[in-house]
Amino acid sequence: MSDSDMDIDDDEVEQKVQVHTIVRESELFDKPPIQASNSHNDVKRHSVTTPLDEQSKIIKEQAFAQDNGTLPRFPAPGIPPRSFFTGGGGNEPEQKRAALPCKFFAKGWCFNGVSCKFLHVKENSNCTSQQLAENSMAGNGGIRSDLERRILDSREGVRVSQLSENGVTSLPTREDISFMNPQRVFSSMSFVNPPGSQRVFPFNNEMRFMPSFENIRRESLKQTYGADFTDNRSLVINNANSFALRSSFVHEHRPSISSYLKTDMGSAGPAWTGSLSSSVPMNDRASTVGDFENGNSLSGSGSLPTLQGVAVSSDKGAEANTTSTKKKVSSDDWEPSEPFKASFTIPPYILPSSDALYDPFTDIENLGDRPLNDSLSSKGEHARKSSCQQKDGDSASGPQARDCKNDDKSSSCSQNQHQETVARSLEAHGVVEGVATSVVDQNDTATPSKEISSATAAENRVVLKRIKPAGHDSWHRSDGSSYKKTKKSDEIDGEVRSDAGMKVMRLFRTAVVETIKEMLKPLWREGRLTKDVHNMIVKKAAEKVVGAAVQFHQVPTDTESVDQYLGLSGTRIVKLVEGYVEKYGKP
């Protein structure tokens, strides 16, 4: 072909492009402008800096693709989106290098948002996998041209922007799905515009699906969740809410959806091939189930699932698995995925048991059940019996001894009874040992009954005086000793306070009496008062002054305060003394 023919073809292509751009402008004026997403902003920003020769090549490719019916309408006429894919070889010189990822966004410091010139890639996503996928797609031997990749990129960006504007924030973005298989992505997106159907492209935040896809979607949902699900929920409609499920369905069918995902993912193996959701991690799949519709998840047979992660395959085995997992859904079937466990648990060996609790009554010794007391009492009885037998053997020598034996038996029996009562009374106070030893010593002595009884009583008193405080303290070891000590300390403090108060009162009373006597001295010298009247006036006046001071809590405590008190109340004391003198003195 000659150069003139090439020029003529270029002119014809430019005329066709102008005609198509005029038609697209007239159609776009009837529609409101689309709020482009991050990818479209990047497209417009980078397309401005594209050289003129590259723009002319891109316009030619668009015109060729439009004639074949494979190019959708773009929101901005004449400005094609820039491809972010890197070139696979030297045969594509018009491709530009991929945009660099934003380092500040990965650290959470980027404040530019949509206007940032770099790609916003999450930390956990593989940044190099996108470039590898793009290189593999670019090196497919010329099967898919650069224009097709640009179309795929623009469609993905527009759909992501629409889902983000409709309130769905958990949809995977361009960066999130960069690690997917490019062959699977292209196969799922290549039949968006099938022959014999209307063109699918979003306008004004709406997504228009084909009727065949709508029927397939309803049938798959009826087989999976029942007929009432598709009747009560408008899943495929031409409005802005086509990607959002109702909250009531989310609350009612969330358990069945999660169980369906777990069973189908574990058993249906090959049924997940050919969909975007098969390459999404399990945690992302489980977190977004029931929250939005995934329009990009298309299976190889052409069925369109509505929930992300629920992919209906054309395999018969997959259909059997999906139908076998159906069950009746109710709002009361909620169960936690894991049993409740407290974040902090106390080990059982730290908690005090009922046996380990303190019992104050265990400190009180039950002296009646002590084996020591039993042994001591048995020793005392054995000693008394042996002493009686020894006395009987010694007194068998003569008749006088027999008479004494009878007397001694009666006296010893009475003595033993008395000592047993004393020992029982003393056992309660912890003096069994001392009493037993004293009883043994007393039984060994051959004294008359009166002397024995008097000596026993005296010795018992000594034993009680010597041993009772220790026994009493041991008896009340838990609470009695402390109470007794505090009582003694209180008594001591009270006595000290009373002694100090008595000294203060004595000092104050003496000062008052001396003051009254000084007032009565002139009258005493004149002879107007007798001795008895003088003493009576001094006594009554002193009691009156001291009683008033005690009543109003004005008793001075030292000599200076006493002098000050008497100086301030001197006039009242003088009037009081004059009154008594006029009453009891001589005229």
From Swiss-Prot:
Keywords, alphabetical: Developmental protein, Differentiation, DNA-binding, Flowering, Metal-binding, Nucleus, Zinc, Zinc-finger
Top-level taxonomic group: Eukaryota
GO cellular component, one term: nucleus
Compositionally skewed regions (Basic and acidic residues) per UniProt: 470-479
Chief place of localization: nucleus
InterPro entries with a match to the protein in the record: Zinc_finger_CCCH, Znf_CCCH, Znf_CCCH_sf
GO term, biological process aspect, one: cell differentiation
Compartments where located: Nucleus
Spans annotated as Disordered: 264-346, 368-421, 467-492
Gene Ontology molecular function: DNA binding; zinc ion binding
A Pfam family annotated for this UniProt entry: zf-CCCH
Chain positions of all zinc fingers (C3H1-type): 96-123
Tissues of expression: Expressed in root and shoot apices and vasculature.
Ranges of Low complexity composition bias in the record: 294-304
Domain notes: The zinc-finger motif is essential for transcription activation.
Function: Transcriptional activator involved in the FRIGIDA-mediated vernalization pathway, but not in the autonomous flowering pathway. Acts cooperatively with FRI (FRIGIDA) or FRL1 (FRIGIDA-LIKE 1) to promote FLC (FLOWERING LOCUS C) expression. Required for the stabilization of the FRI-C complex.
Known partners and oligomeric status: Component of the transcription activator complex FRI-C composed of FRI, FRL1, SUF4, FLX and FES1. Interacts with FLX, (via C-terminus) with FRI (via C-terminus), and with RIN1, a component of the SWR1 chromatin-remodeling complex.
Protein name listed in UniProt: Protein FRIGIDA-ESSENTIAL 1
GN (gene name): FES1
